[in-house]
Amino acid sequence: MPREIITLQCGQCGNQIGVEFWKQLCNEHNIDQEGILKNNNFLNEDRKDIFFYQADDEHFIPGALLFDLEPRVINSIQTSEYRNLYNPENMFISKEGGGAGNNWGCGYSQGHKVEEEIIDMIDREVDNSDNLEGFILSHSIAGGTGSGMGSYLLELLNDNYSKKMIQTFSVFPLLTNESSDVVVQPYNSILTLKRLILSTDSVVVIDNTSLNRIFVERLKLNNPTFQQTNTIISNVMSASTTTLRYPGSMNNDMISLISSLIINPKCHFLITSYTPITIDKHISNVQKTTVLDVMKRLLHTKNIMVSAPVRRGMYISILNIIRGETDPTQVHKGLQRIRDRKLVNFIKWNPASIQVTLAKQSPHVVSQHKVCGLMMANHTSISTLFERCVTQFDRLYKRRAFLENYKKESMFSSADGQGNFEEMESSKEITQNLIDEYKSAERDDYFTNTYI
């Protein structure tokens, strides 16, 4: 019996990533823009019903819910070549249409106002499932809708479907001192982090800073388009679900995939690495791919999609999903070579092993490389990303800068007009606790002190 997964796309970034993700899934499952299966030659080779369901006329419909507070992105989907793929009832655009103005509080409160409509949409999609396993949310934590409304969606899912898995693909903003996507992004980020910490089972962190570096260093592209950036993210999303859609002997469902990476539920933020990267006609500087080569490249800091000092921290767990022309003996040799060269620094309180799953390639997509791979890993250096979020938050908050628009929302209003920002302070404290948890995980006695 299939274990279905419902995807939620929230805000401009989340919906643009979702568009590329569904294009990728359609290609891999031989489904055209109308949802029609192109041929039945490989009908039993895959599990389309994890992400798609069939209408009465047997065309395939994505199990996707699209949310936005301004109409531009969803309107563009409705006029694109994929306009007939999605269920129009599964698209929510705010009637006000003004967006959230890059204000987490506005996005959150607008989500609360339309809670009944949102729940109806989710419940209807859940009722279409025979054996729902969980949800995947794509969003950004920087703006107003993806962060604020995205946070509200996570709380709703956690409250109403607490026994189902919740995973997110969360895009973190540029966190350099010189540049930022949105001036109030430190507030939005810290408020969203609280929900990612408390209301999810797994968060795949995608860092815009590292993506920009990968484009420049690997693809020689100084000014990538949004579509090119979103294609990389959708490739990661697609690769992470390969073993669910093309099942093999391991990690055939969401819970086994996540539980293999997350030993302590508190530390559930994952980093990724993908190789070789191909965008349009731009191919990363990789001439030959073997299992060993791909496994080594996945560990290379330049391929990791989070700006964190991976060499200084420690791996808690690693899962490699390898696709293409592979065999188990090559994997064994690759693991032995990595072990002999001491390329990985694991924490001491958990078995120091790289888990490897060999996944099937879609027969419908011609790959430019013989072997490709995705690494999903739990690594203590992710805490430095959260530290930068806290530092940027403190820099703004100590000056009480740019808080006027937040005061207009009930969560942050007060009778004296000065504003009530306990929610921000609480979010910072919870984020700091997560930072401390990851740092503690580097100690040899962490497991003993935590669980005994």
Swiss-Prot record:
Pfam families named in the record: Tubulin (PF00091), Tubulin_C (PF03953)
A Gene Ontology biological process term: microtubule nucleation
Main location: cytoplasm
SUPFAM superfamilies assigned to the protein according to its UniProt record, in alphabetical order: Tubulin C-terminal domain-like (SSF55307), Tubulin nucleotide-binding domain-like (SSF52490)
Listed name of the protein: Tubulin gamma chain
Keywords, alphabetical: Cytoplasm, Cytoskeleton, GTP-binding, Microtubule, Nucleotide-binding
Residues involved in GTP binding: A142, G143, G144, T145, G146, S147, G148
Role according to the record: Tubulin is the major constituent of microtubules. The gamma chain is found at microtubule organizing centers (MTOC) such as the spindle poles or the centrosome, suggesting that it is involved in the minus-end nucleation of microtubule assembly.
GO MF: GTP binding
Top-level taxon of the source organism: Eukaryota
Family assignment from sequence similarity: Belongs to the tubulin family.
